[in-house]
Amino acid sequence: MTFYLFGIRSFPKLWKSNPYLGLGPGHSYVSLFLSDSCGIRSQQRLFSLKTMSPQNTKATNLIAKARYLRKEEGSNKQVSSVPHFFSAGAAKKRSQMNPQSKDHALPSVRNTIQLPTQPLNSEEWDKLKADFKGKTSFERFIISQMAHSHSSVDVAKSLLAWVAAKNNGIVSYDLLVGYLYLCVFHMQTSEVIDVFEIMKTRYKTLEPGGYSLLIQGLIHSDRWRESLLLLEDIKKVITPSKKNYNDCIQGALLHQDINTAWNLYQELLGHDFVPMLETLKAFFDFGKDIKDDNYSNKLLDILSYLRNNQLYPGESFAHSIKTWFESVPGKQWKGQFTTVQKSGQCLGCGKTIESIQLSPEEYEFLKGRIMRDVIDGGDQYKKTTPQELKRFENFVKSCPPFDIVIDGLNVAKMFPKARESQVLLNVVSQLAKQNLRLLVLGRKHMLRQSFQWRKDEMAEVQKQASCFFADNISKDDPFLLYATLHSGNHCRFITKDLMRDHKACLPDAKTQRLFFKWQQGHQLAIINGFPGSKLTFQHILSYDTVVQTTGDSWHIPYDEDVVERYSYEVPTKWLCLHQKT
């Protein structure tokens, strides 16, 4: 029998009166096709589908001397081509230079079924199901793959009509939500409203994914305020997600309800959520048509929020910020996209970007927090004993302040083909020639004669640097942080470790930002060299990559669309805004 369903309004005729159909709200299967809608991107698909057609001067000088290889060695070009350790995209490039073996990756599960591109009748759906060889439910598999492939609403509608005809009018909740997802994706607002009416009749409550889809679909209609009621329904069970707030804010701005949008934004912040950048962008997009000082001040508060939480707008958001500034009447703002020189000077306006170095007050604050929260209170991040840590503290206090602290085991493994003790000795020897006070942190096994560790080379290391060898079960990071901070703001450290665990151990955004700022200003990276050759250290950034203003100028670092930036990296592109004089 040929069965096409051209209107969702005819669905109730196919269903029985029981309000709880199929699996019911909350079934975990719904998450399979809600990933995009709820702000979670799926990077892997289980099936492959085919579509059918119908300060210390010595330490400072070291940095200056080690920024580049000697000109006579002809290596300036080589050094300049290496991305900075903390620059956006640097980790991606390092991973490409050192690809990991993929020989043991599990093959993805594949199914040869082809998704239809046109609505099917009952006989055609019957045949497609008969050809299906998967172990899961055919209907669930099809609707999930339709969602992933963003199939047309009409094709999904024919699936639901076929299911209803085969099951005495019963359509399971997960199939209905899958259909709703496609309606939302294709912005079929009238269909969303029809599904909304059915769900109100059939279900007393929904699971969060269903609510989220309805909110997202309703905000584009003249019934957008009902999305606010759905938000209240979510609050009765759980805290709404920042995606829920984002959609409601977008709906309020779309329909010119500014007060509701700002109230929702404050409510979002009250939950300690970090707003989605598209939420903040929406305020700037709306603001270019608003000539109101109060609204303008709130947008400037958003920029301060970006600064305080070390957030970076994307390229599109940066364009929205630029457009808004240039639209403010009487202020004569002019924006341009630019970069910052290594000296910290903006190439756009010539102003100097804020220094990466912490103020004395910031340094003492951070030092106290790290000592308390990471060294003394961070047991979950270290493997050592209180006795050994105390022994180390006494050792450090008995020594003059160090200029450089070296993670010995980490540095020794930087060149895998070389003997580890030889690598460490080479690094220590070259630094010792600069008359720097060095501390090498290591493990006791490094002192035992072995293929990787020669006693004579380690004895030479101990002649040129102070050394502390911890138990083999200990972790070096707490020792490295303690020694570096105790030595003073001039002290640098060498390790490839990015210290993300320690940053996460800190209690608030302010302390985490200060830690990352301190790390960028003190961590030395070896970017060139091998045993017996001259080492090259990457320059330490002189400026802080953070949103900043001088009153008559703003400098806003932003993410390029084409660059993949890891959380411990910073953008290299800037939006420069200044007032014409």
UniProtKB/Swiss-Prot annotation:
Mg(2+) 1 binds at D407, D476. It comes from Macaca fascicularis. It holds the Pfam family PRORP. Catalytic ribonuclease component of mitochondrial ribonuclease P, a complex composed of TRMT10C/MRPP1, HSD17B10/MRPP2 and PRORP/MRPP3, which cleaves tRNA molecules in their 5'-ends. The presence of TRMT10C/MRPP1, HSD17B10/MRPP2 is required to catalyze tRNA molecules in their 5'-ends. Catalytic component of mitochondrial ribonuclease P, a complex composed of TRMT10C/MRPP1, HSD17B10/MRPP2 and PRORP/MRPP3. GO terms for cellular component: mitochondrial ribonuclease P complex. Residues 340-576 form the PRORP domain. Displays a distorted and non-productive active site that probably switches to a fully productive state only upon association with TRMT10C/MRPP1, HSD17B10/MRPP2 and pre-tRNA substrate. Degraded by LONP1 following mitochondrial unfolded protein response, probably leading to inhibit translation in mitochondrion. Its cofactor is Mg(2+); Mn(2+). Mg(2+) 2 binds at D477, D497. Keywords: Hydrolase, Magnesium, Manganese, Metal-binding, Mitochondrion, Nuclease, Transit peptide, tRNA processing, Zinc. One of its GO terms (molecular function) is metal ion binding. It catalyses: Endonucleolytic cleavage of RNA, removing 5'-extranucleotides from tRNA precursor. Belongs to the PPR family. P subfamily. It is found in: Mitochondrion. Binds 2 Mg(2+) or Mg(2+) ions per subunit. Zn(2+) binds at C346, C349, H555, C576. Its EC number is 3.1.26.5. GO terms for biological process: mitochondrial tRNA 5'-end processing; tRNA 5'-leader removal. This is Mitochondrial ribonuclease P catalytic subunit. Residues 1-46 form a transit peptide.
